[in-house]
């Protein structure tokens, strides 16, 4: 089991660019580009940049598989701002987070490709998603709890983004751009699922 754990850890480091980020940040320190005190911040920033690039590349690749490239970009553009402030379910490791995100995008694009969303389906999905966001957001994590002020700020921003995206979605449907509107609709639906899962995860953690 120790060997398996070591292999998993090594895979996680490779996938999340930990070693490469460390090497680049140390080279900046050696050249005097940054101070030693800024090393950790620089390393984290580089790793986040690599992670964002990897996730974007993965999103585009999945979009190409389904023939829905611009839809994958629009979904991601609508989902990330909401996710940033609403919170929700978080995987225990960066590798799991990557694969869960890839699976979510694949499921969403499969729905866009193969499942029709008539008005009588879209309206209930939107209403349920809105109720869940208004009731649950923000959903914190056990290792990064939010204080009362942060909760108010995050809740306000999540609701504001939700309202703006709702107006954009309605406008797209009004212009008969149903596919684009459905991308935003499914970003809201995906977020509501993550909020519910995150709330369950937090409750389970507190009981453990």
Where do the PLM segments sit?
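C-terminal ends of transmembrane helices
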Residues: 79-91, 137-145, 196-199
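Structural signature of hydrophobic alpha-helical transmembrane segments
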Residues: 63-76, 122-129
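N-terminal juxtamembrane cytosolic/stromal segments of multi-pass membrane proteins
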Residues: 13-46
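Interfacial aromatic-anchored transmembrane helix boundaries in multi-pass membrane proteins
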Residues: 84-111
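Hydrophobic alpha-helical transmembrane segments in multi-pass integral membrane proteins
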Residues: 108-119, 163-178
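Cytoplasmic-side transmembrane-helix entry/capping segments in multi-pass membrane proteins
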Residues: 93-103, 122-126, 150-155
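Small-residue-rich transmembrane alpha-helices that serve as helix-helix interface/gating elements
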Residues: 182-196
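Membrane-helix boundary/juxtamembrane motif in polytopic membrane proteins
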Residues: 141-163
């Amino acid at each position: 089991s120790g060997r398996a754990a070591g292999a998993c850890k090594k895979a996680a480091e490779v996938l999340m660019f930990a070693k490469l980020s460390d090497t680049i940040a140390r080279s900046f320190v050696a050249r005097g580009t940054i101070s030693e005190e800024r090393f950790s911040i620089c390393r984290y920033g580089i790793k986040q940049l690599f992670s964002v690039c990897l996730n974007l590349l993965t999103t585009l690749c999945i979009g190409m598989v389904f023939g829905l490239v611009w839809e994958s970009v629009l979904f991601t553009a609508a989902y990330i701002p909401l996710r940033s402030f609403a919170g929700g379910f978080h995987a225990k490791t960066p590798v799991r987070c990557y694969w869960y995100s890839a699976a979510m995008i694949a499921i969403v694009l499969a729905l866009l490709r193969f499942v029709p969303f008539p008005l009588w389906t879209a309206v209930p999905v939107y209403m349920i998603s809105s109720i869940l966001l208004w009731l649950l957001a923000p959903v914190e994590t056990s290792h990064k709890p939010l204080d009362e002020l942060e909760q108010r700020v995050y809740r306000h921003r999540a609701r504001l983004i939700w309202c703006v995206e709702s107006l954009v979605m309605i406008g797209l449907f009004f212009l008969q751009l149903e596919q684009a509107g459905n991308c935003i609709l499914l970003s809201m639906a995906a977020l509501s699922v993550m909020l519910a899962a995150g709330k369950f995860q937090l409750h389970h953690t507190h009981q453990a």
